[in-house]
């Protein structure tokens, strides 16, 4: 009676295929880990805080002109006359809640398709400009999948910046910089005269962030 057996070459083939599969899995895992680490680094930078400067436009919309890492999140709004003020936490949360309602009913420009029509030229309101900035990743994090996984948001968020250069500066800043302590001191000084028509803040954080920027 013949005994069942396998040729050595059969095991060699199986072993070779197993090795190829393992190499493929390790390679894919390595690429995924690299992307995960890169995204994690950027997310951690944003989560630590962002100093954002929004500028009012002639159509009463708002654009991000500068933003960079800070140990705490602050949002400065500059009106058409050049006056600046720092938004309070209560005011920011109110704006975000209002924008969240628009996101839920589909009227927020952040989640609408970018058709290039009149809807695009009318610009973004203050709430949508905040959520489109780096600070939106912190302040609007609880909105979650309503916003950040929306493909229209990914495109529209870039349009909340005044120029491609402003957007690129932000990306570079959050990719390789650490939170700046000077941003906190500057923001605290900017809170004086919050509800008044204060002149542009003279804090280093604001002035250094906008130096040489064409407004």
From Swiss-Prot:
A lipid is attached at residue 28 (N-palmitoyl cysteine). A lipid is attached at residue 28 (S-diacylglycerol cysteine). Residues 197-208 have a biased composition (Low complexity). Keywords: Cell membrane, Lipoprotein, Membrane, Palmitate, Signal. Belongs to the UPF0323 family. NCBIfam families: PRK04081.1. This is UPF0323 lipoprotein Hac_0309.
């Amino acid at each position: 009676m013949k005994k069942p057996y396998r040729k050595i070459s059969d095991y060699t083939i199986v072993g070779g295929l197993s090795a190829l599969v393992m190499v493929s899995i390790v390679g894919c895992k390595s690429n995924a880990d690299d992307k995960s680490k890169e995204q994690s680094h950027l997310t951690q930078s944003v989560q630590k805080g962002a100093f954002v400067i929004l500028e009012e436009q002639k159509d009463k919309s708002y654009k991000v002109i500068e933003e960079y890492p800070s140990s705490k999140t602050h949002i400065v709004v500059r009106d058409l006359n050049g006056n600046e003020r720092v938004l309070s936490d209560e005011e920011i949360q109110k704006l975000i809640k209002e924008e969240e309602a628009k996101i839920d009913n589909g009227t927020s420009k952040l989640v609408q398709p970018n058709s290039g029509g009149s809807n695009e030229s009318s610009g973004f309101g203050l709430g949508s400009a905040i959520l489109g900035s780096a600070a939106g990743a912190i302040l609007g994090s609880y909105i979650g999948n309503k916003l950040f996984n929306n493909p229209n948001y990914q495109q529209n968020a870039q349009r909340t910046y005044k120029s491609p250069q402003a957007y690129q500066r932000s990306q570079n800043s959050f990719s390789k910089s650490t939170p700046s302590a000077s941003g906190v001191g500057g923001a605290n000084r900017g809170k004086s005269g919050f509800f008044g028509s204060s002149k542009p803040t003279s804090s280093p954080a604001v002035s250094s962030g906008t130096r040489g920027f064409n407004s």
